[in-house]
């Protein structure tokens, strides 16, 4: 497993179930992990993509200071991604989608010629040979249903940059009473234990 990149995106801080599950997983790996880079996308937010930043991500000789900062940040985040063997993503469902903070991370690392390339046969992802584990928590029960729009999105954007070995772990029914919530966390931990076995 060696090098692990952890992405947290919950707005709930110490009350976050997704962060707790991610911590549980990473700690279970123990000495099998050489290094862990943890990036809390809420505590240290990525700027929202706009026209100026989008222009800066293409590079050039006449960048504004803000564009230079965004490009340097993008380069650093992509370097973290390239140097990792396993990527662990905490992705709580907010209003049927991923948190804004996680979307901002994807927006700044999805760069033509760097993390993907355009070819005559369509786009090709350039970040390959890595395992992705997504822990997604939800207040209700959405797995495999029409309201689960975030999993198709994550599969698409991850695959777009070359990350196709993706495993999802679900913590569901967390706002449906104490008994259901406890069962949801137990089920998620059981799934994570199978991954770490």
Swiss-Prot record:
What keywords would UniProt list here? Flavoprotein, FMN, NAD, Oxidoreductase
Q: Which InterPro entries match?
A: Flavodoxin_fold (IPR003680), Flavoprotein-like_sf (IPR029039), FMN-dep_NADH:Q_OxRdtase_AzoR1 (IPR050104), NADH:quinone_OxRdtase_FMN_depd (IPR023048)
Record's superkingdom? Bacteria
Q: Which reaction does it catalyse?
A: 2 a quinone + NADH + H(+) = 2 a 1,4-benzosemiquinone + NAD(+); N,N-dimethyl-1,4-phenylenediamine + anthranilate + 2 NAD(+) = 2-(4-dimethylaminophenyl)diazenylbenzoate + 2 NADH + 2 H(+)
The cofactor named in the record is:
FMN
* Cofactor binding mode and count: Binds 1 FMN per subunit.
GO molecular function per UniProt: electron transfer activity; FMN binding; oxidoreductase activity, acting on NAD(P)H as acceptor; oxidoreductase activity, acting on NAD(P)H, quinone or similar compound as acceptor
Q: What class of enzyme is it?
A: oxidoreductase
Partners and quaternary state? Answer: Homodimer.
Protein name, as recorded:
FMN-dependent NADH:quinone oxidoreductase 1
Question: From which lineage does this chain's organism come?
Answer: Bacteria, Pseudomonadati, Pseudomonadota, Gammaproteobacteria, Vibrionales
